[in-house]
């Protein structure tokens, strides 16, 4: 019997796959557990429509990420911090502070987990910070750390 898997089934198939399985296995296990549905023409059409919808959403997310990348690369975020001799900061600038400053100064809300700081910023001056907006899109944000008077 041909079935469409609704969820990943170890050793049998992944979500969205169409495979031939034994009738008893399909009727007694896959259908009852909600892991698969029968591969009828109507169900195949619904699966195709769902795949197209997911592709459109993925393309839309990618386009939004590219647009946000263009915006971010034009911006500079200024963060005042207390510093000692030689431009060394007391403490450090974290991704959370960068995200909050970006929101306050430019009105762009960005999740702090998307800001990829290798190490926290510990010195005054300009730093280029990578921001992963999408698995395929990474922007570079300029962060200017100034001395707080």
From Swiss-Prot:
It comes from the Bacteria. The keyword 4Fe-4S does not apply. One of its GO terms (molecular function) is rRNA binding. GO terms for cellular component: ribonucleoprotein complex; ribosome. Keywords: Ribonucleoprotein, Ribosomal protein, RNA-binding, rRNA-binding. The keyword RNA-binding applies. GO terms for biological process: translation. Belongs to the bacterial ribosomal protein bL9 family. Binds to the 23S rRNA. PANTHER family: 50S RIBOSOMAL PROTEIN L9. HAMAP family: Ribosomal_bL9. This is Large ribosomal subunit protein bL9. It comes from Geobacillus stearothermophilus.
């Amino acid at each position: 019997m041909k079935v469409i898997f609704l969820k990943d089934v170890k050793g049998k198939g992944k979500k969205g796959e169409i495979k031939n399985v034994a009738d008893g296995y399909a009727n007694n296990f896959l259908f009852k557990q909600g892991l698969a549905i029968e591969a009828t023409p109507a169900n195949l059409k619904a699966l195709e429509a769902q795949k197209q919808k997911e592709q459109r959403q993925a393309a839309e997310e990618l386009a939004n990420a590219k647009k946000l990348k263009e915006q971010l690369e034009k911006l500079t975020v200024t963060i005042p911090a207390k510093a000692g001799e030689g431009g060394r900061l007391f403490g450090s600038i974290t991704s959370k502070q960068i995200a909050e400053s970006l929101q306050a100064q430019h009105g762009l809300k960005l999740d702090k987990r998307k800001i990829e700081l290798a190490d926290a910023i510990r010195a005054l001056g300009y730093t280029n910070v990578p921001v992963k907006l999408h698995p395929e899109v990474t922007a570079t944000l300029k962060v200017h750390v100034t001395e707080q008077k």
